[in-house]
Structure formats: C-alpha cells, structure tokens
Amino acid sequence: MRIIKGIVAAPRRILLYGQHGVGKSSWAAKAPNPIFINVEDGLCDLECDKTPVLRSITEVYEALIWLGGEEDHGYKTIVIDTLDWMERLIHQAEVELINDRKIKTLADVGFGKGYPRAIPHWDVTLKYLDHLRRVKGMTVVLLAHAKVERFESPEADSYDRYSIDLHKTASGMLQEWCDEVLFAAFRVNTRTEEAGFGKERKLAVGGKDRYIRTSESASCIAKNRLGLPSELPMDWDAYAAYVRKPSVKEQVQVGARPASGNIEGLVVNGSSKSNGSSVGVVEIETPF
C-alpha cells in the first residue's frame, strides 16, 4: 500500500450560500477560469462562461459528463448556480417518474418515502464532481440560497439561524463532502431610538458591507479546513490567499469518456443572453 505523508494540496470543494443579491455568483466568477452550470437563470448580466439554462436534471448530468470527458476544455473551476434550483429539478424528475396525478411534490408521497428518492441523484452528482476534481483538476464551487430555520440545540434553548436552503438530507450530504461551507451576508447593525411614551425601538442600519462567515456560529452553519479567520471580505482573492498551491499534480485514473449525443453550443460565452435552449435529453451513464 502506498502511504501519503503530510499535507496534500488538492482542488477545493466550496459551498457558498447566502442571502439574495449578496453577490454569490459574482464571487464565484472571480475563481480561476470558471464555467457556470446555469440552473437558476440569473447569469445574463454577469460576464462569465455559462451553459444555457438547464431545464432538467438530465441536462445537468450531461453538462457534467461533457466537462469530465476527454476534451481539453481549459476550464479550471466548475460552478453550480444554484443547488436549491438544482434540487427542484431532481424533485421534478422523481415526481414525473411516480406518474401519479395526486403527487405534485415529493412531500405528497406517503410514509416519508418521498424525499429519500432524491438521495441517489446527489450521490451521482458528487461522483461527477469528484471526477472533475481528481481527473480534470477543477475547483468545485456550489452556490445556494440561505433560509432561516429553527435550530433545536441539545445544550440550550432553540433559536433561529441561517442554513442552506435544501432538504436536510441533501444539505447534510453536501456539507460533509465540501472542504468549506461559507455563509455570505450583508453586515447589519442596529441602533436604538426613542419611540415615545418612554419606549424605545431598534432600527437596522448599514447593509452595504458584505462579508463571509467561515466557521460555525449561533447565527449560521459554516466550516472550513484551512484555518481561515472567522470572517473574510466578500472577495475571491481574500479566500484564495489561504489555499495551498499543489506542488505535484496527482491524478486518479478512471475510465473517463465524453457523453454521447450532440453537445455543440453547450457553453454560452461572456455576458450573452441565454435563449433557454437545452442540450437535449440523453440516457445518462456515469463516466467511471
């Protein structure tokens, strides 16, 4: 057995989630030579390379297979924008497979058997992303929106905090897989003013300064494996300064091959507006 000693530098697996309009996509666009898997349809005004808007989970898989194929496409970072919109495609595909007019969402499936149907999709997605990272040397950036949910602490009273806007099983899988789970937010302070009749009220002030939380706190879910400071500026370079640069490129040899079918015109360059065309639905087989 080959023994690996010390630190091994490898492409990062990053999940960045945050409030609407905080600049998640703009942050990811500063990563090395990124290609966006365009699921949410919010990239028209962002200068980046992107796929057309992908309307089914099959199209997402096909895009991932194309990136992992034998062609040297030159992209260094894959960005999925966003995970919560991708989850909708997964749930939509499973509802269609059930083929029951009474079932509109996976929540409608009885005995708690609905949402577990999505787990194999996330397993396949992580295998595709592992392939891109290990064989193609691509950094993986996963973007998602935030939600406020109740956290039942075993050590204190329950309280609200920000979490990833995904079903809890999918959220747990992705958090475990990623090296960094980062929370992006606007910095808001409060001030107190007189409200009359001897009462006071608090007002929110600020809201323009943006920052990234890198470690768990009472307000949000977060983690990192780089020893990052608890907060970073909302800037890719501020994060990248802590990433170890690989000295030796190691590859795991797997049987990679491109997807079947016509995939010409998959990538939309620059800030050109997507016409929403799809890349076609094909039978998907894993490339490894």
How would you describe each model-predicted region?
Residues 2-94:
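Conserved P-loop
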Residues 26-28, 132, 173-174:
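Hydrophobic/aromatic ligand-binding patch that stacks against planar heteroaromatic rings
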Residues 34-36, 140, 181-183:
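Short, well-ordered beta-strand core segments
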Residues 40-44, 83-85, 146-150, 187-190, ...:
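Conserved nucleotide-binding/hydrolysis micro-motifs of P-loop NTPases
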Residues 85-170:
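P-loop NTPase motor core
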Residues 152-268, 282:
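Conserved GTP-binding G-domain of TRAFAC-class P-loop NTPases and closely related GTPase folds
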Residues 266-288:
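Long, low-complexity, intrinsically disordered segments
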